[in-house]
Regions:
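Alpha-helical interface subdomain recognition
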Residues: 1-106
Length: 106
């Protein structure tokens, strides 16, 4: 939650600066990196939660599936689909190079 709010506040700050006419440097690349990391961290948490809830002992008590199979499939599918965020818009390595050039003047 804190990381998400920090990303949102940083995005708003950059947009405000851009609207004011400030030149934008490496900030979009930083946002892209942090955003894709955050999505993957969220997916990992959801995946672990589904894994835990899907234990056989949980469903044995109720006689029903511990997790809705459609939801579990959605979480698993999303986890692997969102891995592509590190590639879309330039791989993480490319984004690191852009940041290095902007910040360090390389």
């Amino acid at each position: 939650e804190i990381r998400l709010q920090a990303l949102e506040m940083t995005s708003l700050r950059i947009l405000t600066e851009a609207d004011a006419g400030s030149q934008i440097g490496a900030e979009p690349s930083m946002l892209k990196l942090k955003g894709s990391e955050l999505v993957q961290a969220q997916d990992e948490l959801l995946f672990r939660m589904v894994d835990h809830l899907a234990l056989a002992q949980d469903s044995a008590n109720t006689g029903e599936a511990a997790v809705n199979p459609a939801w579990a499939e959605y979480v698993a599918s999303g986890r692997y689909h969102h891995r592509g965020y590190t590639i879309a818009g330039g791989s993480s390595e490319v984004q690191h190079n852009i940041i290095a050039k902007q910040v360090l003047g390389l």
